[in-house]
């Protein structure tokens, strides 16, 4: 717990138990409901100005814990925002175009609103669902961090561009203060020289921003 108390927390993607259902998110969520783990996370975020990032299954874990969009670990109910099965009912794996909709998060200190990136996505349960009221509130607060967009940079519900059918074309969400970020796209898969045949910018500089935040 000492390490959790002192630094950033990263919830990575990764299959577990056949990835059905909820992938490794269910195990993350169970572990972090532990009273001592919960206390350590809350102290990290509230007292030590820490950061947390969840990608793919890690994003699912953040949603299940309430860290996004609430910014704290809270009990979930049937009306809580969630990530559920892709609209096509199966796993998808492709490169999607995503737009920075809000850069209020320290994780996005090196990008600008309306920047567009080509980001790998690979998941079976990435469709963001929330009530209309909740969705409007998140958009108004700038908590919808990234969106799936078409070739013109417009948020899209077209399956060619929004592969899971997320409401508001949401690909990533953040906590109210931006220090907790969850996203479905695998920004960590960027390596210089990789995906040479795929057009577009691929480096969101997430980890560069995360390091610079503490300097």
Q: Can you annotate each of these PLM segments?
A:
Residues 8-9, 49-52, 178-181:
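Beta-sheet entry/capping signal
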Residues 95, 100-215:
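C-terminal and late-domain segments of enzyme folds
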Residues 16-106:
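Cysteine-nucleophile active-site neighborhood
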Residues 1-5:
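Short, small-residue-biased leader/transition segments that mark boundaries at the very start
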Residues 10, 23, 44, 80, ...:
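Generic, low-specificity signal for short hydrophobic/alpha-helical stretches with a mild N-terminal bias
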Residues 10-12, 54-56, 120-122, 184:
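Short beta-strand segments
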Residues 7-18:
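N-terminal cofactor/phosphate-binding cores enriched in small/glycine residues
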């Amino acid at each position: 717990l000492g390490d959790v108390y002192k630094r950033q927390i990263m919830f990575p993607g990764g299959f577990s138990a056949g990835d059905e259902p909820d992938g490794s998110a269910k195990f993350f969520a169970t572990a972090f409901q532990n009273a001592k783990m919960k206390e350590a996370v809350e102290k990290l975020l509230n007292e030590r100005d820490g950061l947390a990032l969840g990608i793919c299954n890690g994003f699912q874990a953040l949603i299940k814990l309430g860290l996004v969009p609430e910014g704290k670990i809270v009990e979930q109910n049937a009306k809580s925002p969630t990530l559920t099965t892709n609209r096509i009912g199966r796993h998808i794996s492709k490169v999607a175009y995503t737009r920075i909709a809000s850069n209020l998060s320290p994780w996005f200190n090196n990008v600008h609103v309306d920047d567009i990136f080509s980001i790998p996505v690979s998941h079976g349960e990435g469709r963001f669902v929330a009530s209309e009221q909740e969705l409007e509130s998140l958009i108004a607060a700038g908590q919808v961090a990234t969106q799936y967009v078409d070739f013109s940079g417009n948020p899209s519900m077209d399956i060619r561009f929004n592969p899971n059918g997320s409401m508001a074309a949401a690909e990533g969400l953040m906590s109210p203060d931006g220090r907790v970020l969850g996203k479905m796209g695998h920004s960590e898969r960027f390596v210089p020289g990789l995906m040479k045949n795929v057009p577009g910018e691929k480096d969101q500089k997430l980890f560069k921003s995360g390091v610079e935040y503490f300097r």
